[in-house]
Amino acid sequence: FSVGVALPIAPVTLHNYLADGDLVLVAANGGVNFYIGNNPESDGITAVVPGTRADRWGGQEDQVRIAREALGDDQATARQISEFWYDRGWKYILSDSMGAARHTAYKAFILINAHEVSNNRVIEFVTRHSQIYTLATLRFWVILPLATAGLVIGGGRRQLKSLLVIFLVVYSATLIPFFINARFRLPLAAILIIFAASAVVTWY
């Protein structure tokens, strides 16, 4: 199992080390994404660091500049920059634990909400102007209730169901601390559809 997990990741880690001289497992944007989801101005869905430009490359330059200025090191590595933003996120959480807890609960609500939060595509715009896309898209507000019913009344092997439920819980737990959008919760939908189908089969 460990070898199977390590094989696809190792080439990426090696590339990161050769390119930047820093041991980064896969990517070094976890810290900034954590701060985006855990700061006084976070709304749980907007993927922009407060005080930075909203466009992708401009925002990334600002994130690096702010971190390096605060660290007093204009050669700070990607890993050090990520650690800086993680630290700022944790400082917010520890300074306002109740507010952070309420915000985390709100992000959990967004995760199961019917609204599809756009990230790199404006989903509502596409569905308004494409009948094919509308008909071909099964919305989260349909999938989640059916999946819940499937978990309760559906058949299937208990061990397999348990593994799928564990995935749902663990993936959700790794997503909520950051910020929520439809693209990030898509892996949940893929598993929930299995349980939703189980409910439909049981009923019909």
What are the residue ranges of the model-derived segments?
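Membrane-interface junctions at the ends of membrane-embedded or membrane-associated helices
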Residues: 1, 153-161, 193-204
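Central hydrophobic cores of alpha-helical transmembrane segments
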Residues: 1, 163-170
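Hydrophobic/aromatic-rich transmembrane helices and adjacent perimembrane loops
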Residues: 7, 139, 165, 173-174, ...
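Membrane-proximal stem/loop segments at transmembrane-domain junctions that anchor or position
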Residues: 25-111, 115
